Amino acid sequence: MHKTVLLQEAIEGLNLKEGSWVVDATFGGGGHSLEICRKYKNVKIIALDQDKNALEKAESKFKDCQISFHHTNFRDLDKVLEKEGVKEVDGIIFD
C-alpha cells in the first residue's frame, strides 16, 4: 500500500484557491485528492489512474467532493481535459 508523503507540503505548494482545477495524475489511493477535498470545498479534481480497482474503491470516499474519475494513463491527460471541457488547470499532482 502506498503511503502519501509530504502531504501538507504538496497541498500548500499548489497554492490553491476556491474554484481551482487540479489534476491528480497518479491517483492511486487518493491521499492528496482527499486532503484537497477536505481543505477546499469548491476545488474541482480530475483523477487519473490505470488501476480501475483503485478508482472504484475511492468513489465512496469522494462522494462529497467535486471529482471526476478517469481510468487512463496520465499520457492521455490532454484527451481527458478536452473531454471535461477544461482548457487550463491550476495544479497537477504526480505521486
Question: What is the role of each PLM region?
Answer:
Residues 18-28, 46:
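Conserved class I S-adenosyl-L-methionine
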Residues 3-18, 35:
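Conserved alpha-helix/loop element of class I SAM-dependent methyltransferases that forms part
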Residues 15-21, 87-88:
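Short helix-loop-beta connector
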Residues 58-59:
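Conserved SAM-binding loop
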Residues 62-77:
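Conserved SAM-binding strand-loop segment of SAM-dependent methyltransferases
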Residues 29-42:
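Conserved SAM-binding loop of SAM-dependent methyltransferases across substrates and taxa
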Residues 51:
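Conserved SAM/SAH-binding beta-strand->alpha-helix loop
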Residues 79-94:
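A short acidic, Gly/Pro-enriched loop at the edge of an enzyme's catalytic core
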